[in-house]
Amino acid sequence: MKNKIINGSVIVMIFTIASKVVALLRDSLMASNFGTGTENSIFTFSMRSTMLLVSIGYGLTMAIVPVYSKLDSNNKGKECEELVNNTITVSTIFAAIIVVIAVILAGPIVKVMASDIAMNPVYYSQAVSLLRIMFISIIFVAPQSILAGVLQCNNKFIAPASMSLCSNLVYLIYQVFLLKIYGIMGYGVAVVIGFFIMFAVNVPAYRKLGYRYKFSFNLKDRGLRKIGESLFPIVLSSSLVQISLYILTAIGASVDSSSIVILDYSNKMTMMFYEVFAIAINMVTYPLLSSLKAQNEMGEYKGALIKSVKYILIVLLPVSIGLAILRLPVMAAYLMRGEFTFESVERTSSFLLFMIPTILILSIKDILLRCFFSLDNNRIVLKNSIATIVLTFIITYPLRRMIGENSLAIGYTLTGIVTMIMLYYPLKKEIALKINAKDLKDLLKIVIATIIMSVPVYLIYNLFTSYFALNTKNSILIIGICGIFGVLIYLIALITLRVDEVKEIINIIKNR
């Protein structure tokens, strides 16, 4: 079990890290070209709006996994193929309908959700046109999500993990060679091409499983109906990050449109670590949990859950603390060039500080949500999703006038903490989850190792900044120095404290 989690997670992490490196270059070029100006706000708003609808399609990945796993565990290969074909056809038709409706409503969407942009007729026209182009991407999301889910169930992680890398390469190539020629509107076309490639990259791996697509349209299919019944709570929960950010974008735009860009870059930084590590672990763990539930192996199920949370904490607790200490040089290295000034970097790093806790919060919350999906308990998921949306608005909206744009990050973080706790206790009751003394001892060891790491990193950072200015070159240097020292000290501390999960990872690497 632990070998499956580690081996699969490593594959996903490698591709995700490569994707994020390309994404950082992409965002850096975007910041250099547009800074925190209106064109960047228009692109960010359009992309955020598109991703909100795209996340609906991504819910299909989680919806199909338990249904497919149950059929597969009963050796019903033909029924598995029929389920996939029918789901692809039906979901793609519905996606096309959504695209038509979204294109028609692009104007009102901009007026309601980006009022500051809509006040200028030229910017309004740009935003509407860009939004309509990007909405076409949604057509490719449904088949892409379904194929990715099937491949994950069959422990084929390379193609699904490489999707983001492929699309980010498209965006980077466009920015380097074509942005000055075709501008923001051409970027919208590049986004559509990127989503098509994300679908196409899964097709060869899917065909190697022996499956072939055949047109099938049967709304009465039992498997499809099962997916349909669970889809709304799954889609709502898988869209929570996008919905919450959309609410925050609307609140931020009502005060200052440039806060949209600050929110976007801060979110991208926190999401980078969340996606590289937590998504990698959870992508592997979720099919495993669904399979164990289908086989009624609840002892191993609870073991896999606890093990996954430990792996997340081992990696992301020190990462979160390190990012909090080095937030200014990190954002300077990431963004400070061209139109993006040091003042903008300071503003963004201040905002980032309040968003950093969401790295851990979202990671743990994600694995808890996937537990409820695998247990087919969508009622709790639905309640938690609604609570997240409501609390995001209730907490953030009153704060915006009192503490400015940082209220967006604070509201987002507080909402995450409350809703994570709301997930833990029902799950504890449902599967009789017990955290024993050894688990608590391991957690304490991870915290101690993180403290041991953070003190010298903080001292090195302060020593460096007392002698050198934080330009882009020096920022990269201090990140490298602190990063190397931090990783070495943390690993030595973990090994000295005898954290079992570290021994497991080392043994697996030795035996490869």
Give the ranges of each region predicted by the language model.
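Interhelical loop/hinge segments that connect adjacent transmembrane helices in multipass membrane
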Residues: 1-5, 203-241, 299, 429-447
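Alpha-helical transmembrane segments of multi-pass membrane transporters/permeases
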Residues: 12-13, 136, 147-177, 357, ...
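Helix-loop junctions and terminal segments of transmembrane helices
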Residues: 58-74, 279-297, 302-305, 369
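Short membrane-interface helical motifs at transmembrane helix boundaries
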Residues: 99-121, 321-341, 459-463
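Alpha-helical transmembrane segments of multi-pass membrane proteins
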Residues: 119-146, 340-368, 480
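Membrane-proximal transmembrane or re-entrant/amphipathic helices at the cytosolic face
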Residues: 459-512
